[in-house]
Structures are given as structure tokens and as C-alpha cells.
């Protein structure tokens, strides 16, 4: 099952194939998630775990006068995402950064919107990562999180057994961790396939962080 390890961190030829597959395979999930969030035309957006860059391209379309940053810790993903969004990068509307969600290389209050599609399964410390997302969002900024596996059926457990370092979180786990990071006004949506979408807000007057 070595090929499937590329879902966690694409590397080599297998990784190049995987990010291409992800750009197509995650299209329906991103469409499901993006319908739940309003994005201003001039928004500054951050796509975490940007993979092959397809969702960066969608965010650019949703904010035609804004700027989109993609971040991934895979060099293969960064290269593919830069190629996918070359025109926007040339126009100064896009940047793809090699980095880690555990220590985001951005200043406080930098983005209106942050997104994470099919990626948090592989974040080693979700509490720390969510705190980083909270930090870089502007007041009233939104965090959109979308997963195909929500722990509601055996599908997620099967994939977690095949892919080293993968963990599937329940909706309650995610609610608790997001609130602990300071997020509020959480809105959760699920579809008949079991896909999960959560939109969380960084209020202008943040709520007290809740203990784990």
C-alpha cells in the first residue's frame, strides 16, 4: 500500500500521479464545501494542504479581486500547485508556499478565509494546528473544513488502517477542538455520502478558549 502513503505526503513519481488524481477526485467534495461559505471578491484566502492546486484555482475564481495563498509540506504538491495556478502567480494574485500547518509562516490576522479539504487527517497535533489557523485569520475570518470521512461509518477506519499517520475525527471531536482553539459560531453540514463540512468563525471579540 506504499502508493496510498502519497495521500499523506506526495513524493516521487507516485506522488505526482496522486496530486493529479486529487485535483480530479476531490472536485465534488470542494464543490460541496464551498457552497457553505461566502467569499468576498477581494478576499485574502489561504488553502491549507493545497495538494495539486485545484482548490486554489477555485478560490481565485471566487475572489476575482483578491489573493490566494496555498500551503503544503510536500515539494511535489507545491510544484504541481504552482503549475496549475501559474497565470495567477504571474499576475501577483497567488502564492504557493512550502510550509507546515503546525507553524504557519504568516503574520497574525492575515487572511479572511482559510480552507482545509481532505487534509486534517494527517496533521500531527490538531489542537496546535487549529490554534495556528485561528492566529492567522483576520477578525470575523472563516475557517472551512471539509472531510469525506467523518468517522460515521467503517470507510474512514479502513483508510486509516492502510495509510500510516492518518486519523479520522468525528464531528464532535472537531467541534471540541475548534472551540478550544477559540473558534465560535460553528456550522456543520453533512451529505448522504457522509461527507462533513464545518464552517467556524474567528469572532472580532474572541470567545474564551475552552479547555480540552
What are these regions (language model features)?
Residues 198-212:
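C-terminal lobe and adjacent flexible extensions of AdoMet/dcAdoMet transferase-like proteins
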Residues 24-43, 58:
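Conserved alpha-helix/loop element of class I SAM-dependent methyltransferases that forms part
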Residues 127-139:
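A short glycine-rich, Lys/Arg-flanked "PGG" loop and its adjoining helix->strand segment in the class I
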Residues 102-113:
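A short acidic, Gly/Pro-enriched loop at the edge of an enzyme's catalytic core
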Residues 46-103:
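Class I SAM-dependent methyltransferase SAM/SAH-binding core
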Residues 112-125:
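A short SAM/SAH-binding and catalytic strip from SAM-dependent methyltransferases
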Residues 4, 10-23, 27, 142-199:
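C-terminal alpha-helical "lid/dimerization" subdomain adjacent to the S-adenosyl-L-methionine
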Residues 42, 137-142:
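Short glycine-dipeptide loop
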